[in-house]
């Protein structure tokens, strides 16, 4: 059969192509397909896909990876916004920073008006202005506070207050002369030149004096208490007490009034003659004075009551 096929092939090649029938072509095509399929499946081994090792991020790992990527994206956006804000505030340009300068000596110089909330200078640092120019510090409807430890200087619209637990001292930076100090053991307390009054809630000192050509005025809105551990001595050419309420003098031993004592009766309350003596809850007294200046009171129990009572402290003189 093979010899016949070879002879037919030789005859076909020598005599030209031989036409095949439809059946022969179909059989030939089927044989070619079988041979092709057998060659394709020669090295194929079927394997269960579920038993293969899976690669990549799947399940929870995939979700976690997505969250990390989103978080990194948000951080990048925030970093970009902060960078743009810093760029706009500091004004960094081709010529450098337009708002400030950094020097090798450690000096930081601001070249324009700067808006800051809190400034923390370094150890032994100085905040100042340029030569022949003022350093202007303003607060937007808020006080300006300089604080170091417990010492605080507050500058407000209507007042300036200084708070310190260890004292304070003012001196001239050029001459180094002390203008004002609360170190009473070393320096005597003097008001600075131009200061007319000192407003304090409580003062503890050995002596309060005024200049020889000026008066010493002590004024309070409410109640004033002057207390001394070993007595209170008030000396002056003229001593006047003006008060809207009562004046109370207390002493363990005695109260001595030296000099001329004058009491203005026009300021003392008086009762009309039509008032009944001892009526109601009122108790009336008459103010009396001895020849040596001792004051005492006598209860008014009726009309024409004088100071001649048996238990007066004046003795035989009234």
Curated annotation (Swiss-Prot):
Glycans are attached at residues 158, 211, 258. The chain crosses the membrane at residues 66-86. It is found in: Cell membrane, Sarcolemma; Cytoplasm, Cytoskeleton. Its main location: membrane. Residues 1-65 are cytoplasmic. One of its GO terms (biological process) is muscle organ development. Disulfide bonds join 288-314, 290-307. Keywords: Cell membrane, Cytoplasm, Cytoskeleton, Disulfide bond, Glycoprotein, Membrane, Signal-anchor, Transmembrane, Transmembrane helix. It is a single-pass type II membrane protein. GO terms for cellular component: cytoplasm; cytoskeleton; sarcoglycan complex; sarcolemma. Residues 21-32 have a biased composition (Basic and acidic residues). Residues 87-318 are extracellular. Pfam families: Sarcoglycan_1. Belongs to the sarcoglycan beta/delta/gamma/zeta family. Component of the sarcoglycan complex, a subcomplex of the dystrophin-glycoprotein complex which forms a link between the F-actin cytoskeleton and the extracellular matrix. Cross-link to form 2 major subcomplexes: one consisting of SGCB, SGCD and SGCG and the other consisting of SGCB and SGCD. The association between SGCB and SGCG is particularly strong while SGCA is loosely associated with the other sarcoglycans. This is Beta-sarcoglycan. It comes from Oryctolagus cuniculus (Rabbit).
